[in-house]
């Protein structure tokens, strides 16, 4: 879905990154306890791996990929991440706690 949007806007597709998936799993789990771009330990979101992470989109409560991507595209800051030409890698992870789904999308260059 993200790549369809990027390509429709004249951008190259982002490629899956296993390394970014590791960071997105960490962030998805962290936001179940503190929904913020600040990590539960008080550090910035990108400190999971500052050598890889250059953009982040978070969401909670959406049940489908279409719903969460549509919500991100309706938000100027999240949309800017999805459409940033410099980003060429991406990973998205989800986790569910107490019936609520949390999403972490991490971008790299």
Language model feature labels by segment:
Residues 22-66, 82:
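Short, surface-exposed glycine/acidic/tryptophan-bearing loops
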Residues 60-109:
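Disulfide-stabilized extracellular recognition modules
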Residues 9, 40, 53, 77, ...:
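Residue-level signal for pocket-adjacent positions within structured domains
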Residues 6-8, 12, 50, 74, ...:
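Short, functionally important structural connectors and interaction interfaces within domains
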Residues 1-32:
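A short alpha-helix/helix-coil micro-patch that ends at or immediately precedes a cysteine
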Residues 13-14, 39, 87:
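Secondary-structure boundary/capping signal
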Residues 14, 18, 56, 80-81, ...:
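Flexible, active-site-adjacent loop/turn segments at secondary-structure boundaries
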